[in-house]
Regions:
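Non-transmembrane, membrane-proximal soluble domains of secreted or membrane proteins
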Residues: 2-7, 11-150
Length: 150
């Protein structure tokens, strides 16, 4: 009898602890974006199944969506910052990293970056994160798809 209670208590404790340390999952309303640093520029591409949708230096996401940014670099180690959202990470060749977040309010946020080579590239590595309502996001995606097919 004591053995069963102990087993149940241990199982419950393990489940509670794993819930605390498990990474937040990407939900149904998720946006996956690959950001690639190359020389002095960030390039964004939405990961949509088997295809990528390139969008340049601007990333749009709907308010409240789970967002996963996959960072990598083709050339140097690069710094990626979204200071208004408290996000920062590094992109390195052959070493992808991820940032996950949920943007709670609409707005246009500055993406800042810098190559870690000592030369100033702030303006060239700048980009934008646009957080908007779902209808505006879908309209923007449709516009990007039309542009990529031309």
């Amino acid at each position: 009898m004591a053995w069963n209670r102990t087993s149940v208590a241990c199982s419950a404790l393990c489940a509670a602890l794993s819930a605390c340390v498990a990474p937040r999952s990407i939900g149904v309303d998720a946006v996956d974006v690959r950001l690639v640093a190359e020389d002095t520029t960030w390039r964004a591409a939405y990961l949509t199944g088997q295809q990528e949708l390139p969008t340049g230096r601007e990333v749009h996401v709907p308010v409240g969506a789970d967002v996963r940014l996959v960072l990598t670099s083709r050339t140097y180690i690069s710094d990626f910052r979204l200071p208004e959202l408290g996000l920062r990470d590094f992109a390195a060749p052959d070493l992808p990293s991820e940032l996950r977040f949920r943007a709670a309010r609409a707005g246009r946020y500055d993406v800042r970056g810098d190559e870690l080579c000592g030369r100033p590239h702030t303006e060239k590595t700048r980009g934008w994160l646009v957080v908007e309502d779902a209808a505006s996001f879908q309209a923007w995606i449709r516009k990007q798809r039309r542009g990529s097919q031309q």
